[in-house]
Amino acid sequence: MESCMESKKQGQISIIMPVYNGVSWIGECIESILQQTDTNWELLVLDDHSTDGTTELVLKLAEEDSRIFPILRQRNGVSAARNEGLEKAQGEFVMFVDADDKLDPQMLSVLRAMLGQTESDLAVCDYYRWNGKPDGIYNRSEGLLKTD
């Protein structure tokens, strides 16, 4: 019998992105994933029956890059979408993003390097929050997990 790890794509990162009516920002999010220096990933976009053009945009982007997999679903909410993404993910590692996130181009490379240095089952990273003002105010997250 094949083990779960043998059926997964060794080293690949599955990025799971639930979305509902995110056409205003999902393009920037996907573009930030496409710009990653680490290219061993798949993107599962779980569209919760969007009505604003999100579906069409994701389908177009999937035609342009074979690593993008649109999953069109009935509207069941973000938690159900994430769970479905976990079921369909083919990568050895899983990462969750929201449609309004933007990743630094080195994000996956740094994540992979850190996972390679440890035997960790979970990685948490800092993030910056932009409040939408033209001058861009960012707040760094700190102290989410304690190691002692």
Mark where each language-model region is.
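Nucleotide-sugar donor-binding/catalytic module of glycosyltransferases
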Residues: 2-148
